[in-house]
Swiss-Prot record:
Composition bias, Polar residues: 100-109
The organism of origin for this protein: Bacillus subtilis (strain 168)
Domain S1 motif: 8-77
Any one GO molecular function term: nucleic acid binding
Chief place of localization: cytoplasm
Protein name stated in the entry: General stress protein 13
Length: 130
């Protein structure tokens, strides 16, 4: 099998079956491989049936050949040019808003200080349930 189909080579195949996880492509009369759903096209593929049908002729690139298991991993996406990415505007970071009473000049609170504050708050009469 490895002598017939080299990793990195591109072949023409015929889609013989579709599953939720990918498409089976016949490379010749006795050999077929699997194109995983993530390798069908650039971008997200929700339903493989929207992109492929049984009987379609497709160009596939061999990603891996597993001699022991007799499996060939294929990719249609690797034979296609990647779409151009839109230039996005750089985002401005949001300024952090820290209340002055909740932090020390260094920017953090010690547990000791917060504990004393919590005890004072719990002793306030307007918070005590009747």
């Amino acid at each position: 099998m490895a002598a017939k189909f080299e990793v990195g080579s591109v072949y023409t195949g015929k889609v013989t079956g579709l599953q939720a996880y990918g498409a089976f492509v016949a490379l010749d009369e006795e050999t077929q491989g699997l194109v995983h759903i993530s390798e069908v096209t650039h971008g997200f593929v929700k339903d493989i049936n929207e992109h492929l049908s049984v009987g379609d002729e497709v160009q596939v690139k061999v990603l891996a050949v597993d001699e022991e298991k007799g499996k060939i991993s294929l990719s249609i996406r690797a034979t296609q040019a990647a779409p151009e990415k839109k230039e996005s505007k750089p985002r401005k970071p949001k300024a952090a808003q820290v209340s002055e009473e909740a932090s020390t000049p260094q920017g953090f609170n010690t547990l000791k200080d917060k504990l004393e504050e919590w005890i004072e708050m719990s002793n306030r009469k307007d918070l005590i349930k009747k």
